Structures are given as C-alpha cells and as structure tokens.
Swiss-Prot record:
GO terms for biological process: translation. PROSITE patterns: RIBOSOMAL_L33. Pfam families: Ribosomal_L33. Keywords: Ribonucleoprotein, Ribosomal protein. The gene is rpmG. It comes from Parafrankia sp. (strain EAN1pec). GO terms for cellular component: cytoplasm; ribonucleoprotein complex; ribosome. The keyword Ribonucleoprotein applies. SUPFAM superfamilies: Zn-binding ribosomal proteins. The keyword Ribonucleoprotein applies. Belongs to the bacterial ribosomal protein bL33 family. This is Large ribosomal subunit protein bL33. GO terms for molecular function: structural constituent of ribosome.
Length: 54
C-alpha cells in the first residue's frame, strides 16, 4: 500500500560526498521526476546539490 502513496518519504543524498542527510516527503503528481535541491551538507560543511535517492 505504501508503494502507491501520493506523498512518499524520500531521502536526499549529497552529490559530492554521497551522504544521505535529509528525509522529506514529496508529491508525486506535482514532481514525478527526481527532486534536486541545494541544501547544507554537514559532512562537506557547505551548500551542495542534493538529489532524491530511492
């Protein structure tokens, strides 16, 4: 039942160090593609590109 959830939980991973730093929810109807945001990475200690992982 969770596989067809409209707002699933996703994990955001840093593209530089590959650490999974954030867990958030997204709406699949509005954003069917992978989410990409610039967020702070505590491991890199800078703002980097974070991408949705599955």
């Amino acid at each position: 039942m969770a596989a067809t959830d409209v707002r699933p939980k996703i994990t955001m991973a840093c593209q530089v160090c590959k650490h999974r730093n954030y867990i958030t929810r997204k709406n699949r109807r509005n954003d069917p593609d992978r989410l990409e945001l610039r967020k702070f990475c505590p491991n890199c200690r800078t703002h980097t590109e974070h991408r949705e992982t599955r």
